Amino acid sequence: MIKLRLRRMGKKRQPHYRIVAAEARWPRDGRFIEVIGYYNPRTDPYTLEVNVERARWWLEHGAQPTDTVRALLVRAGVLPPRQQNEAKRETAETAQPEA
């Protein structure tokens, strides 16, 4: 399975990340198929650059983003934000624990 995930770069205690498409079984900092963008959380404000066209192509072809990459793709405008299921929320509120 292909994953969109972060690949750590940089010096010790100074990380920045590349957003890559890689096989899920490959090591985090090992082989990858393609670099899609980069993310630097150490700058103020953070730096995020994503090739939107390639990210959408990978998502259309079945690549699964990790939770962190999903959040970054939402910030970049590639993915819509997750919507909470209204029905699930209502049942949780109406269900009262029996005492």
From Swiss-Prot:
GO terms for cellular component: cytoplasm; small ribosomal subunit. It comes from the Bacteria. Keywords: Ribonucleoprotein, Ribosomal protein. GO terms for biological process: translation. GO terms for molecular function: structural constituent of ribosome. Residues 80-99 are annotated as: Disordered. The keyword Transmembrane helix does not apply. Signal peptide: none annotated. InterPro entries: Ribosomal_bS16, Ribosomal_bS16_dom_sf. Gene3D superfamilies: 3.30.1320.10. HAMAP family: Ribosomal_bS16. Belongs to the bacterial ribosomal protein bS16 family. This is Small ribosomal subunit protein bS16. It comes from Thermomicrobium roseum (strain ATCC 27502 / DSM 5159 / P-2). The gene is rpsP.
